[in-house]
Amino acid sequence: MARPAKPAEEPQVEALCCELGFRLPPAAVTGLTVYLNMLQKWSAVMNLVGPRTWQPMVRTLIVDSLHLDRFLRDAVPQCGPQIWDFGAGAGLPGIPLRMVWQHGEYHMVDVREKRTMFMQMVLARHPLSGTFVHRARVEDFMADRAPADMLVSRAFMPWPELLSLLEGRIRQGGHVIVLANEPAPDHDRPDAAHGRPLPSGWDLTAQYVYEVEGSARYFWALSSKKAPS
């Protein structure tokens, strides 16, 4: 039987984040250590994430949240208060993001019971202001809510279907933030994965690229040009 993985300790987590180029405040280091240890423990018995130990979790998963913090501060500095995160899964990128970026109300939505239970337990252990977990279909979640100011999507669904789903659900001037493995499309430039140009109701307002273990990853900021009906 394999030995249980050693738990993360705050000095180790802080040092690894510094190695990756991120100097975190003490409260974020504490919260991230709690999260990593819970993620490591739960992933030993269920398929929450691919990595099973905390170091590769930081290098390949948490790093997305830390880069996303930088991107949002630069690309969407005046974001409104209602932020949605669909298909939040194990709380990535949302929970680590909220440890360093506390803007507005951040609503993580997932239909899967065990994943929402995990996120709720993390927030019970380490509360994050303005951060909420919802177990629901996204269609039901959106049904009785005003349009959002921003939506974050990491592998929830292909972006063309996502923008169709969000028709009338993002306020005019609001943003959809897509975490992707390829450059963003534009109105006259289809994307590589789907061969689709950006629809006329959206503008690409910012893009960010970074490298994780030799592969490029991207954030797209897509701004809604239409007022909700």
Curated annotation (Swiss-Prot):
**EC number, as in UniProt:** 2.1.1.170
Where does the record say this protein resides? Cytoplasm
Q: Which reaction is this enzyme known to catalyze?
A: guanosine(527) in 16S rRNA + S-adenosyl-L-methionine = N(7)-methylguanosine(527) in 16S rRNA + S-adenosyl-L-homocysteine
Cite the Pfam families for this sequence. GidB (PF02527)
Q: Name one GO molecular function term.
A: rRNA (guanine-N7-)-methyltransferase activity
InterPro entries, per this entry? Answer: rRNA_ssu_MeTfrase_G, SAM-dependent_MTases_sf
GO annotation, cellular component aspect: cytosol
- SUPFAM superfamilies from the xrefs? S-adenosyl-L-methionine-dependent methyltransferases
Positions of S-adenosyl-L-methionine binding: 87, 92, 138-139, 154
Which keywords has UniProt assigned to this entry?
Cytoplasm, Methyltransferase, rRNA processing, S-adenosyl-L-methionine, Transferase
For this protein, the record's PANTHER family field holds: S-ADENOSYL-L-METHIONINE-DEPENDENT METHYLTRANSFERASES SUPERFAMILY PROTEIN
HAMAP family attached to this UniProt entry: 16SrRNA_methyltr_G (MF_00074)
- Purpose of the protein: Specifically methylates the N7 position of guanine in position 527 of 16S rRNA.
UniProt record similarity statement: Belongs to the methyltransferase superfamily. RNA methyltransferase RsmG family.
Q: What is this protein called?
A: Ribosomal RNA small subunit methyltransferase G
Species this protein is from: Oleidesulfovibrio alaskensis (strain ATCC BAA-1058 / DSM 17464 / G20)
